[in-house]
Structure formats: structure tokens, C-alpha cells
Amino acid sequence: MLSIRTVLGPLAAILLTVIGPFGAHGSGLADKVMWAVNAGGESHVDVHGIHYRKDPLEGRVGRASDYGMKLPILRSNPEDQVLYQTERYNEDSFGYDIPIKEEGEYVIVLKFAEVYFAQSQQKVFDIRVNGHTVVKDLDIFDRVGHSTAHDEIIPISIKKGKLSVQGEVSTFTGKLSVEFVKGYYDNPKVCALYIMKGTADDVPQLQPHPGLEKKEEEEEEEEEEGSPSKKQSNKNRVQSGPRTPNPYASDNSSLMFPILVAFGVFIPTLFCLCRL
């Protein structure tokens, strides 16, 4: 019996060491979240233990849509696709007000997926936090494509009655206002959002997007190549169509024609006069 305990003791310690951090991370993350909403949908508990409440704007502002329920959402856990399949939109700007009593470091996590439009420049809008524009011209399809999860992560700091976000500072009176601002292209929207204490490093990352990573790598390669590639493309450029005729050459020919005609008439006339 003693030998079994001697073996199981260290084994249990190893298991707790390996499993412990994962269990603690899940429960710890949920404890850090102070406010979460499934916009346009019902309450939901995600794989991290975050409890999203039913949309408090239901019947008050904007419209709820579950159009995305018929589509699978890339980059999202299968259990949490509902967070990207429902949404709230409005024909004008709208938002959520979140009371915050304690000072400290916070993170706003906004969840989106484009489930309707299939090209860029169809739905574009801004996002403001207490009047500060934190996301400009958000085009979800342009960022990640169709029916694909996209998160906007916005760190903020509240200290000594001041809100700091992206280098801007304003007076904070205990209420955080997250606003989705109407633009020129369609209506602003959001699928889900939550506020948590901590930093951006504490936010769970979405699953990899192979197409998006390839696009970013190509953009980085183009930036590294710089001007030589542009020079080469200019060098290999083919002219489209024939050269444009010189307008001044045509003007000279048109001026010479009357002179030649006059000269041709003058010579025979002079010859006839001489014979007389």
C-alpha cells in the first residue's frame, strides 16, 4: 500500500500541475468579465465560461437578426457560433451603456461576422467609446471575408476619474458608452460584446484564418520589396493603343494647303497676261 501511495502521490501532483492552469484560466477569465451581451440573441455561456446575457436593447433600439443562423461561422468554436450568427443593427447610430465602478485596466471585446453582404464597401461604420473613435471605417467583409468571425479588441484605462483609450483622455463619470456609428454604407451592427478587467493579452484568440494569414504575408512581402517592384512593373508596362497624333503637325499641313493652291492659280494667270 505504501508503494502505491508513493507512486500515485507524485503522479497526482503532475496531473494537477498540467491540468490546473487550464482549468484556472477558464474560470479565471469568466471571473474577469463584468458585462457581456449576445446582441440580437438569447443568453449563452461560451467555452471559456463567459455568460452572455440576452440583449437588453430588445424592443427598444434597432432590430435583431438571426439571418446568420443558416451559416457556419469560420474561426469560431462550434459551440460559440451563435455569438456571431445573431446580431443587432440599426438604421442610425446606436450603442450600449455599461456602468463601471472600479478603476483599473479593462478590455472591450466586440464580435462581428458579415453574413449578408458578399463584397467590400457594402457595410462600413465607425465605433466610438465615450466619444473617442476607436475603430474607423470598419468593413467586416474587407477584413476577413464572408461568414467569418472577427473580433475588435480595445484596451482602455480608468484612473483618477479619467478614461484613456488609444492615446486620448477624457473625463470618466462611471459609465462606459460603446457606440456603433452610422456611415455612408448600410447600417452599423454588432454580434456580441463583453467588458473584462485585464489586458489584451488576456483575451482568447480566434482560430487561425489561413486565407487571412496568406494575405498578410503577401502584403508584408510587398512592403519589403518596396520601390524596386514598382519600377519593374512600370518597366514591363505595355502601352494600350497607338500613339496620339501630333496636333501641331496637322495644323502645319492645313496651313500649307491654301498657299499651294494660291500659288498654282497665280502662275497660269501670270503666263496668260505675259502673252497679251
Curated annotation (Swiss-Prot):
Ranges where the record places region Disordered: 202-249
Stretches in topological domain Lumenal: 27-253
Function: Carbohydrate-binding protein with a strong ligand preference for Glc2-N-glycan. May play a role in the early steps of protein N-glycosylation. Can bind di- or higher oligomers but not monomers of glucose, including maltose, maltotriose, maltotetraose, maltoheptaose, nigerose, kojibose, cellobiose and isomaltose, although based on their subcellular locations, these are unlikely to all be physiological ligands.
Protein name: Malectin-B
Glycosylation sites per record: 252
GO cellular component: endoplasmic reticulum; endoplasmic reticulum membrane; membrane
Taxonomy, superkingdom: Eukaryota
Biased composition (Acidic residues): 216-226
Family listed: Belongs to the malectin family.
One term of GO molecular function: carbohydrate binding
Keywords: Carbohydrate metabolism, Endoplasmic reticulum, Glycoprotein, Membrane, Signal, Transmembrane, Transmembrane helix
